[in-house]
Structure formats: structure tokens, C-alpha cells
Amino acid sequence: MGKPFRKTKFEKRNKMNLKQKFLPFLFLGITSLATAQEIKSEFNKEVKVQKKMSYILDMPQNTKSKIPLIVFLHGSGERGNDLEIVKNHSPFTYKNLIKEPVAILAPQCPANTWWDTEAVYFLIKEISEKYKIDKDRIYLTGLSMGGWGTLKLAGEHPEMFAAVSAVCAPTDRAMWANIHNYKDLNIKLFHGGMDDIVLPENAFNFYQKLHPVNPKAELTIFPNDNHNSWDSTYSDPKLYEWMLSLKKSKN
């Protein structure tokens, strides 16, 4: 029978050294747990953000009184830095149908982005302060991506606009969730019944949410139009007659 195993002095000393080495780390962990705290607070600070946006403003000359302003938001195909193309498919094309002097403002969305509605809001405010604009007669319209921007901006700042018209506009759940923001707006929706780019369901679903809180809201479907329902919308003089007949103070 072999002798019982005995630890040498070296092994005992080595084991004690290991314990001594790891002991500070054990205390460190306990100390860390003891000093941890949960902080609940609120961040509240004014943050300045630079906004930059190109635009075209068609401003009648030699007008003595303040004039109405139509703001037009283009679709995704007109993004970039060629300002001339923002006038495509827009009220600019049908200015001859508008029976009174109006200013038309068309900002341009940068390439590869969607509308920054906060930037558009501050642009409209600046234009309405800088020029002779009737602030009770500011109208907002847009097509496709610009229709989405129109509904988004109108929901964020309904107090700014006398009337709103969105054409072949994508809609989203954030708009549906905040549908009460649209309850006092004069608003018309237009869509092509054969639209295979932005499906008509976008208009139907939004209108179903909108109409119960805003019975005066209207939806027009052009049954034979595809995504180009802007042609049928902006070529109709009645759109401009409807817009210009409305004022914020007399909604």
C-alpha cells in the first residue's frame, strides 16, 4: 500500500499565493456591485440643426395686396440638384388655370432621401415672412413621394394650411395613429385606380381612418389612371378654385 499523498510546502505556498492574487478581484466585484446606481432623469436641451434646401419660388410682380401661396412637393423622380425639373407634373404646368395671382413654392428634395418635412415647414415660414404672403391662404399639395410629404407635414402642422391635397400618396401607420391631427383640415385625396406603383389601398385605408374624424374630407379615384393621376388632378381648374376659396380663419 502506497504512502498517503501529501502536499509539499511549495504547493501549499503556491495555493496561498493564488488566493492572495485573486482576492482583490473578488473584493473589486463586490465593491462594484455595492456602488452601482440607477439614474432616472430627462434630457431637455435646445439643439440647433442646420437645414439646407433648394427651391423655386414663382412670385407675381406688382401686387399691392398679400397673395396666396401654393406649396408643391415633387415626387422621387425630381430629387437631386436640377431645380428646373421640380416644375414637372405640377401646378407650374397649369398656371393658366389659376384665376388670381398666386405664389408657387417648389422646394427640391436632395438625392437618395425622402422629404424632410421640418425643413419644408421652416422654409414656408421664411417665405411667408420675407414676401407678401397671405398667411391665411397657404395651400399644400404634392404627388407620390411628395404626396407622402404633404400628408406628413399637414399632420405635423395642420395650423399652417388652409387646404391640402395629396396625389397618389403612400401612407403609413404613423399617419393613421395620429389621424386626429387632420380632423379640422380641408383635405382632398386623389389616386389612380390602376396605380401599380403606390397601390390605391394607400388612399382607401387612410380615407377610412380620416373620414370618421373629418367628414368633409374627400377621396377621388380616377379609375383609368395609373401612377400618373397627377395629370388628372392638376389639370382640373376646380382644384385651384376649391383651394383658393378657403382661408384658415374661415374653415
Question: Where does each model-flagged region fall?
Answer:
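A domain-start/cap signature at the N-terminus of enzymes
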Residues: 2-5, 9, 13, 34-69, ...
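Hydrophobic h-region of N-terminal signal peptides that target proteins for export
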Residues: 27-35
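Gly/Ser-rich "nucleophile elbow"/oxyanion-hole loop immediately N-terminal to the catalytic nucleophile
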Residues: 64-65, 112-144
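Active-site machinery of serine-nucleophile hydrolases
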Residues: 69, 76-117
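The conserved beta1-alpha1 loop
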Residues: 73-74, 191
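Primarily recognizes the serine-hydrolase "nucleophile elbow" in alpha/beta-hydrolase
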Residues: 137-181
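Short beta-strand/loop motif that positions the catalytic acidic residue
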Residues: 189-191, 195
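C-terminal catalytic histidine-bearing segment of alpha/beta-hydrolase fold enzymes
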Residues: 196-251
